[in-house]
Regions:
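Alpha-helical transmembrane signal-anchor/signal-peptide segments
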Residues: 58-74
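Hydrophobic cores of alpha-helical transmembrane segments in multi-pass inner/ER membrane proteins
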Residues: 11-22
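Soluble catalytic domains of enzymes that build or remodel membrane lipids, polysaccharides, and related
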Residues: 76-286
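Internal/C-terminal transmembrane anchor helices
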Residues: 31-57
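Single conserved hydrophobic/aromatic residue that forms the stacking wall/gate
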Residues: 1-11
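Membrane-interfacial segments
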Residues: 21-30, 60-61
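Short Gly/Pro-enriched turn/cap motifs at secondary-structure boundaries
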Residues: 2, 57-59, 271-274
Length: 286
């Protein structure tokens, strides 16, 4: 299986430039020429530049990162099967920038995937965030379709709702919008992917985060009745892997999102590593 996921990275190759640019400011302000002051000024300039770059430039530099997954349990018919994983669009953060999402959809479709999976957090808070993007996202195409799961933001827990009923209605609307886009939402359930005479199970659980994040997932229910098959699990929060999936199930492969690399990635480094043992890329166990 070839799995591609998209990301937008903060570029680290230009950082030296801004270290040099700090020198004239130092002289102009006539600050004491101590290593401590110089280091502090440089770090401050770098932080501001990186934030601005990531916010306005880096986030639209979509990249496809290809990973090849192999397993003796994977049926032969799935050799070369192509999956594109998308996650954490937080579509409300793209208001006024529909061209970027069109660019993303075109990039995904150009991979000619057999399957597209979306691993949660489609919105920040409300389903109406999709108003300008629903038709665009409906353009995602794959041979076996688009499957999705819910992330912690999709339940609307961080918005001040007038009532619990309003929050519940928002979730219903979000599910309806995904269906209208042609996305097949897996809520603690599974389906089968078929190639020739072979098949594998695609399992999706609702958000199953570590506290304080919400826990709606029901893995035993989602995988009931598919013993012995190769199992591909979609679960939003990567900590679910070590908390339940690894010790209590026979899942072969899990795809997750959620971490965002803590909004900062320089090469292969992200501060996420101090919170999430698995924060980006492929990890093998056993």
């Amino acid at each position: 299986i070839n799995i591609g996921d998209w990301s937008s990275d903060v570029c680290s190759s230009d950082l030296v430039l801004f270290t040099v640019l700090g020198i004239p400011f130092h002289k102009w302000l006539r600050w004491p020429r101590t290593p401590f002051i110089c280091t502090g000024l440089t770090l401050a300039v770098l932080s501001i530049v990186m934030i601005l770059y990531g916010s306005f430039v880096g986030r639209t530099r979509f990249e496809v990162k290809e990973v090849t997954y192999t397993s003796p349990r994977l049926p032969q018919a799935f050799d070369g099967y192509r999956i594109v994983q998308l996650s954490d669009l937080h579509i409300g953060s793209w208001q006024g920038n529909t061209p970027a999402i069109r660019k993303l959809v075109d990039l995904v479709n150009a991979q000619q995937p057999d399957l597209i999976v979306f691993t949660g957090d489609l919105v920040n808070h409300r389903a109406v965030e999709l108003n300008d993007f629903q038709e665009i996202l409906a353009g995602l195409k794959a041979g076996d379709g688009v499957y999705s799961i819910l992330g912690n933001h999709d339940y609307g827990p961080y918005f001040h709702w007038k009532s619990k009923q309003d929050q519940d209605n928002n979730l219903i609307e979000l599910k309806q919008r995904q269906a209208a886009m042609g996305w097949k939402l897996l809520n603690n359930e599974h389906t089968f992917l078929i190639q020739g005479n072979d098949s594998i199970a695609l399992i999706g659980v609702e958000n199953q985060g570590e506290p304080p994040f919400s826990q709606h997932g029901d893995l035993p229910k989602a995988k009931a009745g598919i013993e012995g098959m190769f199992k591909l699990l979609l679960s939003h929060n990567p900590t679910h892997w070590r908390r339940e999936v690894l010790p209590e199930s026979d899942i072969d492969l899990m795809l997750a999102g959620h971490t965002h690399a803590m909004q900062l990635q320089l090469g292969n480094y992200s501060p996420s590593v101090y919170i999430y043992p698995e924060w980006g890329g492929m990890y093998l166990e056993g």
